[in-house]
Amino acid sequence: MNKSYPNHSLENFFSTNLSATDDAVFAGIQAEFTRQNEQIELIASENIVSKAVMQAQGTCLTNKYAEGYPGRRYYGGCEHVDTVEAIAIERAKKLFNCEYANVQPHSGAQANGAVKLALLQPGDTILGMSLDAGGHLTHGARPALSGKWFNAVQYGVDRETLEINYDDVRALALEHKPKMIIAGGSAIPRTIDFAKFREIADEVNAILMVDMAHIAGLIATGAHPSPLPHAHVVTTTTHKTLRGPRGGMILTNHEDIIKKINSAVFPGLQGGPLMHVIAAKAVAFGEALGPEFKTYIDSVINNAKVLAEVLQTRGCDIVTGGTDTHLMLVDLRPKGLKGNKAEEALERAGITCNKNGIPFDTEKPMITSGIRLGTPAGTSRGFGAEEFKLIGNWIGDVLDGLVNNPEGDAIVEKRVRKEVKELCSRFPLYQ
């Protein structure tokens, strides 16, 4: 026995790998790695992080409690995690050209909740985009806390263009006088006019909050206009197009607002921050500050346009007629299909996406009339325009098979799955 470990069990505790200690969990992780490696990921809110980001999350920082903020902690021994969090904050501020950042929210939903806790009172009126039009649960959807604790008024999209109608947003704001207006969402394929939202907010003396979770990577590189010159406060996730760990962040240029935000995040909503995740955020922000990240985002957008164009040639109806961003909504009604059945058929063929409501959808949320597709993950593993042309045609083949048979075309799905696996083998993950 090693003399440095009087208790023999400790020697194993600090040295034995997961594969030797927990077969069941290790097997689940390996199975998920195989799935990611052999399937094409088109879920718009997912991405593939670098090995460095993954390594940061698997460090000893997971052991450290650090309630409070750098230099003002409730626990001792925080000098090194203070350094890491300070790096994350400074990189976030540089990346988005803003004055203040809070990198502690565990998720985008937590970030949105913290903003409301900081700046609103229960019962206040908020104006956000409806879920079916492309908004998010946290923007006032009835089943969510934001729809229960606040008087949530929802704006949608124009019935003709299927884009935001700013005159309609203004009319709702003038009618309901919201305390907060929320811009952004989870399924908006077109550029958002943040300046117009600020004009409307100022007209009714409302706070403008922008949720840029889906387009943060695009904003960081200048591929989408930044909300920071216009919004009072901006929230985001740190995954999606930003290609970092799963987490949230809050940005602002207003000192009075960041003081309220910091108190709302801790102690208002959260306890100890996840320091290993904050370290990974810092790594991801550092990556996003490099020139390669702009090239990546440019490819994400170009690949999305290519995919949308191919799908249109295959008879698919793309909501708004195309995309300016990383995602698109496919309206399946012209093909007589439901989103849930399309999702299932595509997954059988090795292509992962999600069923999604479309504007003015009459189907239930677990059925839907559409699917949402995104290019961030595929682009991260190296897919370019030629690969996305293939992917678009594979999707077309699978959907056509579903049109001809409600259970799908097993022969087509098997053939596509084989071709998908062959393509993925040329672009392996984490070698």
UniProtKB/Swiss-Prot annotation:
Q: Which UniProt keywords apply?
A: Amino-acid biosynthesis, Cytoplasm, One-carbon metabolism, Pyridoxal phosphate, Transferase
Q: What is its EC number?
A: 2.1.2.1
- Pathway(s) this gene product operates in, as recorded in its UniProt entry: One-carbon metabolism; tetrahydrofolate interconversion; Amino-acid biosynthesis; glycine biosynthesis; glycine from L-serine: step 1/1
The site feature described as Plays an important role in substrate specificity is recorded at 239
Q: Does the keyword Cytoplasm apply?
A: yes
Q: Per its Swiss-Prot or TrEMBL entry, what cofactor is needed?
A: pyridoxal 5'-phosphate
What SUPFAM superfamilies does the record tag this protein with?
Answer: PLP-dependent transferases
Q: Where in the cell is it found?
A: Cytoplasm
The family database entries (CDD domains) matched by this protein are listed as: SHMT (cd00378)
Binding-site residues, (6S)-5,6,7,8-tetrahydrofolate: 131, 135-137
Keyword Ribosomal protein in annotation: no
Q: Which reaction does it catalyse?
A: (6R)-5,10-methylene-5,6,7,8-tetrahydrofolate + glycine + H2O = (6S)-5,6,7,8-tetrahydrofolate + L-serine
PROSITE patterns linked to this entry: SHMT
Q: What processes does the entry annotate via GO biological process terms?
A: glycine biosynthetic process from serine; tetrahydrofolate interconversion
Question: GO CC annotation: what is one?
Answer: cytosol
MF terms from GO for this chain are:
glycine hydroxymethyltransferase activity; pyridoxal phosphate binding
- List residues modified as N6-(pyridoxal phosphate)lysine: 240
Q: How does it assemble?
A: Homodimer.
Q: Which family does it belong to?
A: Belongs to the SHMT family.
Q: What does this protein do?
A: Catalyzes the reversible interconversion of serine and glycine with tetrahydrofolate (THF) serving as the one-carbon carrier. This reaction serves as the major source of one-carbon groups required for the biosynthesis of purines, thymidylate, methionine, and other important biomolecules. Also exhibits THF-independent aldolase activity toward beta-hydroxyamino acids, producing glycine and aldehydes, via a retro-aldol mechanism.
- What's the name of the protein? Serine hydroxymethyltransferase 2
Protein source organism: Vibrio parahaemolyticus serotype O3:K6 (strain RIMD 2210633)
